[in-house]
Amino acid sequence: MKLNSNINNNINNSSNSNNNFDAKNIIVDTITPPDPSVEFERKLAKSIFCLVHFIVYCVIIFRKGTILDQAFKDKDYFYLIWTHCVFFFAIGTYFLISSKRPGFVSLSNQNLNNNNNNNGSSNKFILEDSMGCIPQLNINPTPNYSKISNIKRKLKNSSGDITKNQENEDLVPLMEISKNIDEDSINDDTITTTTTTTTTTSTSTIPEISNDDDDNNNENNNDNVNNRNNNNSNGEKEDNDIDKLKNHYFCKKCLVDIPLRTKHCVKCNRCVLKYDHHCVFIGGCVGLNNHKNFLLFLLAESLLLLLGLRIIVTGFVRENSIKEWIFSNIAIIPPTLLIFGGLCMPFALFCFHSFLILTNQSSWEFNKYQRITYLKPFSKRGINPFNKGPWNNLKKFLKGDENPSDWILLSKYEVDQMKKKEENTFNIWNNKYYSCCG
């Protein structure tokens, strides 16, 4: 099987084109309807949430002896009004977070960097070679789809074992393909290309940067290979990893260029800006656009559950024996346990997300810090490249003016300066003399 000269010329021309990615041009999708399965999950979550709250509300109201029941009897309208305001405030914040989009990357971003007024708009394809490397090909103007499919099939079958990403195979670093492809080297058995890519060799959320990148870049330069110093320090390797990082990636599911801090959600089947997590309680993702609403919901729900616990414990009847006590209070024991257990989770999440906001992180980045491509080189240094200080992080979060164009990785010099600043600032919990956090 051979590629015709037209396709070769298109690949060579596209490799020489300027493919600069500008995060300012990212379009957030607010129109496209969600996937039917996601919409069903959201409706189911809303139904369960409302049903549980309605049942607990009825138990609290009709239970004799509670302070709420006493307020109804005494016609204490002030107490009734503010308690019900807390209840409806929590319900309102839930419907707000469950209906607001997290910040999906619009599929129209497929042609962001192309001139749509010209006939030469490029189309993006992902091909895997025999080493599991995934370059981005911009084939211009129109690819031969049958040959591309055959190439992709050949590439997958040419290697017996292709190491693939176990968690998320959708995000790959956006690299440039080499300028020339030797047409004579393409045959029915193998397809060889000279590319600068990142091999997906681990079970990370997005492919990690391998220390073998230097070998791949210099495999055709025997002098550099022979003169390679095998005793490089860990600091030098980390610096090299930082230099290789890119400020944007490519999603092979959505076929769009995406900025940093963006992840493809398997359940929503969309790329989410500043992906935090997929929450089953709201039936959707938490991301850039609804993280503030999610924090507000956690606060309102915590206050509601705390108030509900305060009211329901006043409805317990005292008895002489444990058996009689259980029999007399059997109706409110399950709701009490439900409220107490429910209170622990949103309050703990509220505290955790408050910490994430002050440090400018997401749950995904916090949990997978050492496995995410663009954060892995910084993990050994203990630096968050997006942290601008607690006060600045909080102001940007509350104003809601955070932009994907602000998510730019630090240079080696900036990392070293931040490290020196942290070393010079004495921290009672973690410093150069001892660490209380391991």
Swiss-Prot record:
Residues 190-206, 218-234 have a biased composition (Low complexity). The DHHC domain is required for palmitoyltransferase activity. Its main location: membrane. It catalyses: L-cysteinyl-[protein] + hexadecanoyl-CoA = S-hexadecanoyl-L-cysteinyl-[protein] + CoA. It comes from the Eukaryota. Keywords: Acyltransferase, Glycoprotein, Lipoprotein, Membrane, Palmitate, Transferase, Transmembrane, Transmembrane helix. PROSITE patterns: DHHC. It comes from Dictyostelium discoideum. Its EC number is 2.3.1.225. One of its GO terms (biological process) is protein targeting to membrane. It is an enzyme of class 2 (transferase). Disulfide bonds: none annotated. This is Putative ZDHHC-type palmitoyltransferase 7. Residues 249-299 form the DHHC domain. It is found in: Membrane. Belongs to the DHHC palmitoyltransferase family. It is a multi-pass membrane protein. Pfam families: DHHC (PF01529). GO terms for molecular function: protein-cysteine S-palmitoyltransferase activity. The chain crosses the membrane at residues 48-68, 77-97, 294-314, 330-350. Residues 183-239 are annotated as: Disordered. The keyword Lipoprotein applies.
